[in-house]
């Protein structure tokens, strides 16, 4: 199959030699199907193996503060604009956050994310509670602490960095062109600014999106190119698992091949960036969950998600072993 006059394997070779795939080439790849799609997966797997070998990384999260979010994101169970019946509670205490870190580390994960609902964390007592938990996690030395606390001020970012935070997670969720269809309570540039600020203070940045919201494949490419421009360190890929009570509750489910197609595109656009498959994995990929690595992913989130149960870590570990892959053991710094 010829892609903009370049065979897929030749395109992969040029990427491995340091070339960047163009917007036109990426858009052409969105039209692939059938055997050509299998060739795309093979190319993406080749690029993944070049940069990450046979190692894959695991991460886990804790819903550290749930519900009552003032944002109106159309997919979110925790938005106060939607009647979802989600559990609502304030920031968990340090002992609970530390216990969560130990549990996630025990399953071989390299990163543990403390996730709070809301537009952004309140400076003062709430931020200091998170920083205290980060210091305690770093002191045990078993897993790298991450946080997803909404938009950041420079003061908060510097305080988190000083406490020992390794990774800051803040998704753009979708492309700039589609974002107004998903959220009206803040601007896309607010999210971009938080990503830039986190990088500015020296944090590793985890930033990706959620697919199946009604966006086009071209808009998925648009997001990937934005992430490349922002030079993020890790890209989490989520697939919509609709929540009753949200505006997107009746969205049509993605096909497994559509999900894998998206993963492969992201690998070729972001060849040396960690790509982690997170929410919606079981519902959308079903029997093809193990194919995420063959399509170019270099990691998965294991355990529970924010408001839904995830797959048992033991099942994920067995899947990785069956593929002849190994868990990356080195802790992020």
From Swiss-Prot:
Q: Which CDD domains match?
A: Radical_SAM (cd01335)
- Coiled-coil blocks: none
* UniProt KW keywords: 2Fe-2S, 4Fe-4S, Biotin biosynthesis, Iron, Iron-sulfur, Metal-binding, S-adenosyl-L-methionine, Transferase
Q: Where does [2Fe-2S] cluster bind?
A: 206
Query: What cofactors are annotated for this protein?
Result: [4Fe-4S] cluster; [2Fe-2S] cluster
What is this enzyme's catalytic activity, as reactions?
(4R,5S)-dethiobiotin + (sulfur carrier)-SH + 2 reduced [2Fe-2S]-[ferredoxin] + 2 S-adenosyl-L-methionine = (sulfur carrier)-H + biotin + 2 5'-deoxyadenosine + 2 L-methionine + 2 oxidized [2Fe-2S]-[ferredoxin]
Q: Where does [4Fe-4S] cluster bind?
A: 69, 73, 76
Carries keyword Cell wall biogenesis/degradation?
no
Q: Which residues form the signal peptide?
A: none
What does the entry give for GO biological process? biotin biosynthetic process
The enzyme's E.C. designation: 2.8.1.6
A GO term for molecular function: biotin synthase activity
Record's superkingdom?
A: Bacteria
| One Pfam short name | Radical_SAM
Q: Quote the cofactor binding remark.
A: Binds 1 [4Fe-4S] cluster. The cluster is coordinated with 3 cysteines and an exchangeable S-adenosyl-L-methionine.
Query: Which InterPro entries does the annotation name?
Result: Aldolase_TIM, BATS_dom, Biotin_synth/BioAB, Biotin_synthase, Elp3/MiaA/NifB-like_rSAM, rSAM
Please name the PROSITE patterns in this protein's record. RADICAL_SAM (PS51918)
Record pathway:
Cofactor biosynthesis; biotin biosynthesis; biotin from 7,8-diaminononanoate: step 2/2
Similarity comment: family membership: Belongs to the radical SAM superfamily. Biotin synthase family.
Q: Say what the protein does.
A: Catalyzes the conversion of dethiobiotin (DTB) to biotin by the insertion of a sulfur atom into dethiobiotin via a radical-based mechanism.
Tell me which HAMAP family the record gives: BioB
Under the subunit heading, UniProt states: Homodimer.
**PANTHER family (alphabetical):** BIOTIN SYNTHASE, BIOTIN SYNTHASE, MITOCHONDRIAL
The name this protein goes by in its record: Biotin synthase
Organism whose genome encodes this protein: Trichlorobacter lovleyi (strain ATCC BAA-1151 / DSM 17278 / SZ) (Geobacter lovleyi)
Whichever gene encodes this chain, its name is bioB
């Amino acid at each position: 199959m010829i892609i903009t006059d370049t065979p897929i394997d030749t395109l992969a070779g040029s990427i491995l030699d340091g070339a960047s795939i163009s917007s036109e080439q990426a858009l052409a790849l969105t039209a692939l199907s059938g055997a050509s799609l299998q060739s795309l997966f093979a190319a993406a797997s080749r690029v993944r193996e070049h940069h990450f070998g046979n190692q894959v990384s695991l991460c886990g999260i804790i819903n550290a503060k749930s519900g009552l979010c003032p944002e109106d994101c159309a997919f979110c169970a925790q938005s106060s604009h939607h009647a979802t019946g989600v559990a609502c509670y304030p920031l968990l205490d340090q002992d609970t956050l530390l216990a969560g870190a130990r549990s996630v580390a025990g399953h071989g994960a390299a990163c543990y994310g403390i996730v709070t609902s809301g537009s952004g964390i309140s400076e003062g007592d709430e931020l200091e509670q998170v920083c205290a938990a980060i210091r305690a996690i770093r002191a045990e030395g078993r897993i790298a602490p991450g946080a997803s606390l909404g938009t950041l001020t420079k003061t908060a970012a510097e305080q988190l960095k000083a406490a020992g935070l390794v990774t800051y997670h803040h998704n753009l969720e979708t492309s700039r062109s589609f974002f107004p269809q998903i959220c009206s309570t803040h601007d896309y540039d607010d999210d971009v600014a938080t990503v830039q600020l986190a990088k500015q203070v020296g944090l590793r940045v985890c930033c990706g999106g959620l697919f199946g919201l009604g966006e086009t494949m071209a808009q998925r490419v648009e997001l990937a190119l934005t992430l490349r421009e922002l030079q993020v360190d890790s890209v989490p890929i989520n697939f919509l698992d609709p929540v009753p009570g949200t505006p997107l509750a009746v969205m049509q489910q993605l096909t497994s091949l559509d999900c894998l197609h998206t993963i492969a595109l992201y690998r070729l656009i972001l060849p040396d960036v960690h790509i982690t498959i997170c929410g919606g994995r079981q519902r959308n990929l079903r029997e093809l969950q193990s194919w995420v690595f063959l399509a170019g992913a270099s990691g998965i989130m294991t355990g529970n998600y924010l408001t839904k149960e995830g797959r048992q870590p033991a099942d994920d570990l067995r899947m990785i072993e069956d593929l002849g892959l190994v868990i990356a053991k080195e802790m992020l710094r």
